[in-house]
Amino acid sequence: MEKKGQHGTYESMMTHHPILCIIALSVLFIAIDPFHMSPIGGREFKPVKHEVAPYKEVMGSWPRDNLSRLGNHGKLEFVDQVFGPESLEFDSLGRGPYTGLADGRVVRWMGEAIGWETFSVVTSKWSEEACVRGVDSTTNKQWKHEKLCGRPLGLRFHKETGNLYIADAYYGLLVVGPEGGIATPLATHVEGKPILFANDLDIHRNGSIFFTDTSKRYDRANHFFILLEGESTGRLLRYDPPTKTTHIVLEGLAFPNGIQLSKDQSFLLFTETTNCRLVKYWLEGPKMGEVEVVADLPGFPDNVRINEEGQFWVAIDCCRTPAQEVLTNNPWIRSIYFRLPIPMKLLAKTMGMRMYTVISRFDEEGKVLEVLEDRQGKVMKLWIGTVAHNHIATLPYPLTMNQ
């Protein structure tokens, strides 16, 4: 009897199951991505399942701002004057705001007569010719220059010294004096390895500086891969000025981002962007050293800041979708989906993701006190920075009841 070889089996399958064969070959082609046409672009891509609260559970209980008050009452200021102003700070004399830009500068607002002036840069390698690209600064055209120019993200003033501390995505933790200039590096390595993606910081009353390192594998220019993979190599770090040493406080975090000490500094809050949640880390008391999830969020959180009452404002890129949850829970689908030769914007749109800004106010226990939305995606006085756009948003606050 004649035996069927592999070639004969393949022909038989093509004859009897042509659609299945085409699907199988298509999946194989996509998995290989030979022409590097997908958003992954030939990179090593190993998506994993990560911890996100169920979509229905979060969205079913989340209070919505049906009046879209942020969108209707917020104002866009300094349009095309500031590029990717991530964090906003005022100094102890009330001057500012100060903000870090996508071109590597920290700038300060000097009033209408003068406008914005360069206050500091994070490296002596910075030059206007190499780094300043105007409105293109917040596009991928700037990414290849960020390692040279720097990308200052988190800013905090020391209330007593007036020094400005900077978390730069490429140059780590730095400090610059009240008069500005070139910042001095404080922490670029921890345990002998580079800090790859410093993101935000806060200063404890004892002088220690807590800051987030978003990933040990990807820098800021490749931050989308942190989200797409669901990898959790991020860390919470602490720099101690007296000893000039940096320590790992927490590790295994999924895109740790914004950070804020509580009013009494017994704990700090930080956001985990990938896992869509607000997390508490206890610094004092019977729970010292413990970690708690205080709020599951409807979208991807960025910065967190405190108000005078000890409540917390959290900026969120909203909102999650059911399709996105399917990808989150099924890494193998993600592995195929993001290897499709389709632009990322279209892949996101297919998942129903149309991002807009939500600003939410929480108490110390994670209870939602207020939600402000910009459902039109345009965007206090709340001052609202944005890492991806070329403006600052402000909102008269508090809003009156009829607003």
From Swiss-Prot:
Matching Pfam families, A to Z? Answer: SSL_N, Str_synth
Give GO cellular component annotations, separated by semicolons. vacuole
Give the UniProt subcellular location, in the record's own words.
Answer: Vacuole
Could you mention a single GO BP entry for this protein?
pollen development
Source species, domain of life: Eukaryota
Glycosylation, residue list: N66, N206
Q: Please list which residues make up the signal peptide.
A: 1-42
Q: Which InterPro entries match?
A: 6-blade_b-propeller_TolB-like, Strictosidine_synth_cons-reg
- What's this chain's function? Required for the exine formation during pollen development.
Q: What name is this protein filed under?
A: Protein STRICTOSIDINE SYNTHASE-LIKE 13
